[in-house]
Amino acid sequence: MKKCLILAALLAAPAAQADSPFPLMRDIAGDRELPRPYGVGIDFFTLDQGYDIDSLAFSLPGVGGVDTDVIDVDNNVRESDIKFDVWVLPFLNVFGIFGHVSGDTAVDLSAVPLPLPVPLGTLDIEYSGQVFGGGATLAFAGEHWFTSLTGTYTKSDLSGDFDSDVKSVTWQPRVGYLNGPWVFFAGGYYIDTEEKHQGAIALPGLGSVPFDVTLQSNSKFNPSLGVYYRFTDHAETTLELGGGNGRQTTLLNFTWRFGG
């Protein structure tokens, strides 16, 4: 399906090039070269991070609230998506994304003080499904510099052993140096993710025990460094690596631009 969507967008390029209304207000850019207004791209994104537990409940007789401070949670996410974008204004790009996400979250319950004959161990939550969302980028540039801010909202339609829901809001500030087809930049990721999982786990001697857990990112920001290269005015790629504050991120993008 992804290949069909990309092919359809590329076949539509000649028609878009013939008469494109975007970007609007292009005269405010003066004699600066603007990118072609339409883009279709492929993103590959990975995220490793820790979580805090907002709430955790087990349906066990005689068990009340659980001390979540003794629980460690690790999360790994892998996402690939197709991104469609348009420069509505010389400084404003809007986009939509659709793709596939998979992840695994390990909730270490071994230190939870519950009156059970054996420790709880680790609750492993695996999920996969479709991810969709959208966002916008504000960008300003001089002859050899640029700055931008991108905001993205995504929601996932997931399948797995449990009833799962994942929502995420991301902000990406960047500032960089322009040198011909190359752009070198520093930035970061502010990622606010909420995961909710409901289901049942098998405990020795107790059988199937229902649970309900809500998770939040425990460190919302990490810095990043990246590089962009423009092969032609149609083809461009970006690589961005981030780390710090208990989080690691990787982004690889290839975009085909058309119209103008």
PLM segments and residue spans:
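Short glycine/proline- and aromatic-enriched beta-strand/turn motifs that initiate or cap beta-hairpins
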Residues: 18-81, 85-86, 96
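Extracellular loop and loop/strand-boundary signature of outer-membrane beta-barrel proteins
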Residues: 27, 66-70, 117-124, 157-162, ...
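Outer-envelope beta-barrel architecture signal
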Residues: 34-40, 90-92, 143-147, 169, ...
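Residues that define the transmembrane beta-barrel architecture of outer-membrane proteins
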Residues: 36, 76-80, 126-132, 155, ...
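Residues on the lipid-exposed face of transmembrane beta-strands in outer-membrane beta-barrel proteins
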Residues: 42, 82-90, 96, 134-140, ...
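Transmembrane beta-strands of outer-membrane beta-barrel pores
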Residues: 44-50, 98-104, 140-144, 151-157, ...
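Outer-membrane beta-barrel translocator domains and adjoining extracellular loop/strand segments
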Residues: 52-59, 105-113, 158-165, 196-203, ...
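Outer membrane beta-barrel transmembrane domains
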Residues: 183-260
